[in-house]
Amino acid sequence: KDILGILLLMLFLMLLVLFAPDLLGDPDNYTPANPLSTPPHIKPEWYFLFAYAILRSIPNKLGGVLALVSSILILILMPFLHTSKQRSMMFRPFSQCLFWILVADLLTLTWIGGQPVEYPFIIIGQLASILYFFIILVLMPITSTIENNLLKW
């Protein structure tokens, strides 16, 4: 039974690739390219759109690249920034609230990264980028300190 399903799936994929390769493609890929500017439909994969939005939110190229790199590196450094004595978030309502705000901010940045560079999206991207760094670098350590002090009671 399993081999039959795998063979049917492989047959379907082979038919798709060999007889209709453009069926799942983006029609924007067939427009003539301007070598002086990046086409608007060119964007990174969905899991890097939040970093792309942070890159575009800073007008300076070097500043944007530094913000992009730091936005990814900060995710690697987050376990080291965690200074709370209690490891679980079950009994830490401030951290839970902060976590869900960060998730909403990351979803907003991901959405903005896929939008064109126009007026309302630029401002939203800049505010969401500031909030991203503010939550991770300022609010999370302060929240951990407050919750550590509450544990002493």
From Swiss-Prot:
Coiled-coil residues: none
Gene Ontology process terms (BP): mitochondrial electron transport, ubiquinol to cytochrome c
Reported impact of residue 37 to N: In haplotype CNT1
Cited PROSITE patterns: CYTB_CTER (PS51003)
Keywords assigned by UniProt, alphabetized: Electron transport, Heme, Iron, Membrane, Metal-binding, Mitochondrion, Mitochondrion inner membrane, Respiratory chain, Transmembrane, Transmembrane helix, Transport, Ubiquinone
Gene3D superfamilies, A to Z: Cytochrome Bc1 Complex, Chain C
Record-linked SUPFAM superfamilies: a domain/subunit of cytochrome bc1 complex (Ubiquinol-cytochrome c reductase) (SSF81648)
Free-text remark on how the cofactor is bound: Binds 2 heme groups non-covalently.
MF-aspect GO terms: metal ion binding; ubiquinol-cytochrome-c reductase activity
Regions crossing the membrane: 1-20, 62-82, 94-114, 121-141
Keyword Electron transport: yes
Cofactor(s) this protein cannot do without: heme
Subcellular location: Mitochondrion inner membrane
GO cellular component, one term: mitochondrial inner membrane
Anything else known: Heme 1 (or BL or b562) is low-potential and absorbs at about 562 nm, and heme 2 (or BH or b566) is high-potential and absorbs at about 566 nm.
Subunit structure of this chain's protein: The cytochrome bc1 complex contains 11 subunits: 3 respiratory subunits (MT-CYB, CYC1 and UQCRFS1), 2 core proteins (UQCRC1 and UQCRC2) and 6 low-molecular weight proteins (UQCRH/QCR6, UQCRB/QCR7, UQCRQ/QCR8, UQCR10/QCR9, UQCR11/QCR10 and a cleavage product of UQCRFS1). This cytochrome bc1 complex then forms a dimer.
Family statement: Belongs to the cytochrome b family.
Function noted in UniProt: Component of the ubiquinol-cytochrome c reductase complex (complex III or cytochrome b-c1 complex) that is part of the mitochondrial respiratory chain. The b-c1 complex mediates electron transfer from ubiquinol to cytochrome c. Contributes to the generation of a proton gradient across the mitochondrial membrane that is then used for ATP synthesis.
Protein name as annotated: Cytochrome b
